[in-house]
Amino acid sequence: MIAVPGYGLVYGYSWLDWTMFAILYVVTGLGITVGYHRLLTHRSFECPDWVKGCLLVAGGWALQNSGAKWTADHLRHHAHCDDPADPYNAKRGFWYSHCGWLLDPVPCNDERFGSRVMQDRV
């Protein structure tokens, strides 16, 4: 995330490049926070299928896995917060909880934690 604007400052981006960067930053952020997190994981609200589809596509653009996998991992995190079964256990350090856990081969029980999302037709 830091390297992309840094590269642009050194080598120069057009206004279109900077605009697309800003728009996609916001759109993918909304896809993850509103779509994957609030809608799929916590079921905070209901929306038409086309809105859900748009949020899932935007979340997919963030390259943080599918909505079903992301939700399963996050529900597992809530079920086992800061214990050894927590996929992004903060007790293992900032870098591990932020991105290192993705490299850990410990499998997530997607069938248990992601079954509700897998049954959604969207």
Question: Which residues make up each language-model segment?
Answer:
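Non-catalytic, topology-defining segments of multipass membrane proteins
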Residues: 1-122
